[in-house]
């Protein structure tokens, strides 16, 4: 491998690492924005046609639906989540493929109440991303709660790369 090829390889690896870090940052700020009720910043993390697949029975499609989730004054987000929660993402791994990417990880949401802090939800997540003019944006988030009907190895394994 000559110097030019080595330099091309290093540049490609650096670009991928920067993309991975940008996606990791997006997921971190996404959680903070949900916790703090920062609607516009929350929405900025999504593509305009983004889909949030919360459960087998609840999917939100598009910016208007996501905005409704965050800004409905009588909704769960405003009454229970905002300024009372912590969204924590763990065991995160990210795969970039050109202008698309996906991430996998677990999440835990804690809620503070009169009787202390309790785990509200814990589960598996799969995110899809697209590179947009202003950086990476989520196009889809699939969330499945531990103990739900589609929780388990089959859901997780369906997104994992084949073993080499």
Where are these regions (language model features)?
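Short, low-complexity N-terminal intrinsically disordered segments enriched in polar/charged residues
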Residues: 1-32, 36, 44
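A beta-strand edge to alpha-helix "cap/lid" segment located at domain peripheries
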Residues: 2-11, 78-164
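Short, charged/polar micro-motifs that form catalytic or ligand-binding hotspots
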Residues: 32, 56, 119
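Surface-exposed helix-capping loop/turn segments at secondary-structure junctions
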Residues: 37-41, 134-135
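A solvent-exposed, acidic/Ser-Thr-rich amphipathic alpha-helical stretch
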Residues: 39-107
């Amino acid at each position: 491998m000559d110097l030019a090829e080595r330099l091309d390889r290093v540049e490609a690896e650096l670009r991928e690492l920067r993309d991975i870090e940008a996606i990791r940052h997006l997921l971190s700020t996404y959680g903070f924005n949900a916790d703090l009720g920062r609607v516009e910043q929350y929405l900025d993390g999504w593509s305009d046609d983004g889909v949030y697949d919360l459960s087998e029975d609840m999917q939100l499609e598009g910016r208007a639906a996501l905005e409704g989730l965050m800004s409905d004054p009588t909704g769960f987000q405003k009454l229970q989540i905002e300024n009372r929660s912590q969204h924590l993402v763990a065991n995160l791994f990210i795969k970039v493929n050109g202008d698309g990417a996906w991430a996998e990880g677990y999440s835990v949401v804690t809620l503070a109440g009169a009787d202390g802090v309790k785990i509200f939800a814990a589960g598996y997540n799969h995110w899809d991303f697209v590179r947009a003019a202003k950086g990476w944006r989520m196009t889809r988030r699939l969330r499945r709660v531990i103990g739900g009907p589609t929780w388990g190895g089959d859901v997780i394994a369906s997104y994992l790369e084949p073993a080499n």
